[in-house]
Amino acid sequence: MKKKNAFGTILIAAGLIILAGAVSMKLWAAYKQKAMLDAFQTTIQTTETSVTDAGSSDQNTLGVLEIPKIDLTVAIGKDVTKETLKYSVGHFEGTALPGEKGNCSIAGHRSYTYSQFFNRLDEVSIGDIIKIKTSKGTFSYVVYDKFIVEPSHVEVLNPSADATLTLVTCTPIRVATHRLIVKARLQ
């Protein structure tokens, strides 16, 4: 009987440790996200009179992505490294900057623990508005397409003739065998 009780106690303790780890990761991600947003806001306030480029801050924050339809406001990191995507969405280096001619491409994770920024991206519809705030201003995009591709179909990141926005995330959430793509045009 004592062995069963000890085994049960060990299982409960292990479960609590796993749960505590998941909660702490989520809290840490929220803290890092707030720090990025605060740093970006400080940059905007200090550079309002002289702005040289969209990524003028010394921080890793390019701007802020807002999707009102899904109540999302998230910092945009300047790259798509594993570290950046833990705490924000990220801008694919080599693609257009927000508001510029070309294809501004941004990636974000969907998960059950941390980095849940694009969990509701599948709820975005054609005609919805997506906003990006940078040190150069606020840019509004209108969604014109949404589709799913294989992970190898990287042509969705190719340059475009117009100022467009491409949001990329894994789908479905649990197995992530494909990529959900949301395309939008600058208004």
Please place each PLM-identified region on the residue numbering:
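N-terminal Lys/Arg-rich, disordered targeting/topogenic segments
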Residues: 1-2
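Solvent-exposed, non-transmembrane regions of membrane-associated and secreted proteins
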Residues: 5-187
